[in-house]
Amino acid sequence: MQTLPDLIPFDPNALLLGYQKRWVADTSQLKIAEKSRRTGLTWAEAADDVMIASLAKSEGGSDVFYIGSNKEMAREFIDACAMWAAQFNRAAGQIQEELFNDEDKDILTYVIYFASGFKIKALSSNPKNLRGMQGVVCIDEAAFHEKLAEVLKAALALTMWGAKVRLISTHNGVDNLFNQLIQDSRAGRKSYSVHTITLDDACAEGLYQRICQVSKQLWTPEKEAAWKAGLLRETATEDDALEEYYCVPKASSGAYIPRPMIERAATEGKAKLRFECDAKFMEWTEDERTVITSEFCLTQLLPHLQALNPDRRHAFGVDFARSADLSVYAVCAVQPDTARHFDLTLEIKNCPYNQQKQIMLFMLANLPRLIGAAFDATGNGGYLAEAALIRYGSSMVEAVQLNEKWYREWMPKYKALYESGYIQIPKDEEIILDHGHIQVINGVPKIDKSRSKDKSGKRHGDSAVAYCMAVRASYMTGGEIDFIPLPDKHSDRSENDEFDDFISNWDW
């Protein structure tokens, strides 16, 4: 499958806009698009379908079946296919009207036949119509089909012999099957390739510029802003505007992971440590701070690291903070049954950058079968991420810029672990409360802006972010690094000698 950039600037000479090109280039057997109104994605689908139907069978050609929610949509789609056939100079007959028997009623449908022997045909939404068919199935405005589950069941049966299924729609409520398919795909429970196209996404790649080009208007940023504002202003409610133009299904608000589900995952025996620096810590010299931190690593951290199961693969996640919130370092053990166990959590408060780096490198060096690390590299967090990248390389370390796209991709996978019972976290009230900060905001599960209090200050969902980072790191496939244990404490050398070597050899 051809991979295209996430942002393709507008080209007035190109037939398709960037998001349309990515949709066509995606050859996944199952793909789904949540989109803003009138972004032209069905038009791009028509271009792709003409290419498919015009190819010989040996080249991957096949029939295409379009299922819209009404007759007018069917005619509009077939007209678009005819236009593309002429544009591509693909041999095709005229649009034909045929009578299709649908439950003892003769339904007028539209079809184009190609010289390849294949056709593009518009069908009604009766799932029985797909019986005996083979080819690409496009279900347009899927969220508005009364029998979507039955139509989809019939369409998916075709995939046994290599057929492909495309679902395109704006949203129609948070509980709609269309939205559930998207959430299940993001959580990894289903394998649809998901495309998200908001009004802002489409405009960033030239939607309004194309509208101006076609209507022979002069485009300016000010005109585009006024046009968008007008669209949003005319919708009945803000919720309607978000659903129609920003892919946010209605009624999507509140806690993302229910507390009972989090409490079910809370497990006795999962270690939680804390390293807190008081005001005097900054008065020590750098060497003194290094020694103090090293002592914590050797006396407090190391026993827990050595207690980790050496047969399990381990991932590492970090949510960074310098003073206002906590830094949280999370160690995730991947179990043979794919469950994720958070066997060690370290909370760091008011700690200088160098000492946070020191602790981070110490933990990574002592993790059994390390498979990956993910860091919140937003803002000052980039310092830690860069240090890890230099040491372990980009195949083992991901520096994450926290944004809606990342949350949209990884929070559903994280939530799915709770839903399936495949996660264990420390049985700790503060960590449970952290997860209450994951809220669905404008359709995206992410950390809200509120803060809760712990014994020594404010929290901001810190452990929830670190855990999600570690889950992301557990999917990394860059390799595996095993740890080299420190010399046995019962060896002939003294503890002071070991400590001196540790200090002198460490890359601060």
From Swiss-Prot:
It holds the Pfam family Terminase_6N. It comes from the Bacteria. InterPro entries: P-loop_NTPase (IPR027417), Phage_Mu_Gp28 (IPR012036). To phage Mu protein gp28. This is Mu-like prophage FluMu protein gp28. It comes from Haemophilus influenzae (strain ATCC 51907 / DSM 11121 / KW20 / Rd).
